């Protein structure tokens, strides 16, 4: 059984399902590699116009695989004993983790098309970070969220310390990291962590309907919106206005923009191609 399922749908939505239900989709090495490969394929494939990410079974993602962590720690210790310079071992392990971050959370956050996390259950630790990387979070009423890192004596990874404060504020983010409190779907909606809460049995249906609506839209413009929004997270207003002006003019020259103008004049709905 593969750790990640991948489906390209006729409506332009790619559905990626984390598929280790017996462990609440905890992140094995294989899962991280496959997820990164499928996200890269989605980014390259123009036929994919929206990406949906969910989990099989009762959980979205329970974060890192603790058994795998123990094995890696043992291997790291052995490698450290074999090498004269333990800093080299740390550098290698750090670089490997960074590659995992780039292939997953960063790609979800930056790819030039909408990404939607359909959170069906628990999303904690790196699993929380992963769903925060998506543009939009639609969650089951049974979803639960937490940072969890304190419980295993770790500081956090997969971009959570960057993304969480931008959604819930720095004070609440610090509290969530320091306490590892688990919050339910209603609380997550209240504090701005998620966008929508739906009935558990309707999550996939309603989530994919939402994704299909995005996929039928001007996805090239969505990509430029994301570029502006991401740039604005760290830029000055002056710099962002330059960026907006440039991308606005580029968007105005696009096939989709010209189609939208024609459709308006002809009193019909536009048929966007994502270009």
Kindly give the residue locations of the regions a language model identified.
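Conserved CoA-thioester-binding segment of acyl-CoA-metabolizing enzymes
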Residues: 1-56, 70
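Terminal peptide-recognition signature
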Residues: 16, 20, 34-35, 53, ...
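Charged catalytic carboxylate motif
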Residues: 30-34, 100, 107, 206, ...
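Glycine- (often His-adjacent) and acidic-residue-rich active-site loop
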Residues: 55-107, 153
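Localized chelating/binding microdomains
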Residues: 93, 151, 233, 247
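Crotonase-fold acyl-CoA enzyme core
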Residues: 106-222, 249-262, 268, 275
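Short, charged, surface-exposed hinge/linker loops at domain edges
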Residues: 226-235
